[in-house]
């Protein structure tokens, strides 16, 4: 599966 991570 796809994994998305973001920091902001």
UniProtKB/Swiss-Prot annotation:
Annotated GO CC locations: extracellular region
Protein name per the record: Kinin-4
Keyword entries, A-Z: Amidation, Neuropeptide, Secreted
Family of the protein in this entry: Belongs to the kinin family.
Organism: Periplaneta americana
Lineage of source species: Eukaryota, Metazoa, Ecdysozoa, Arthropoda, Hexapoda
Domain of life: Eukaryota
Residues bearing PTM Glycine amide: 8
Function (record text): Mediates visceral muscle contractile activity (myotropic activity).
Disulfide cysteine pairs (residue numbers): none
GO biological process, alphabetically ordered: neuropeptide signaling pathway
Subcellular location: Secreted
First-listed, main subcellular location of the protein, grouped into a coarse class: secreted
């Amino acid at each position: 599966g796809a994994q998305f991570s973001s920091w902001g």
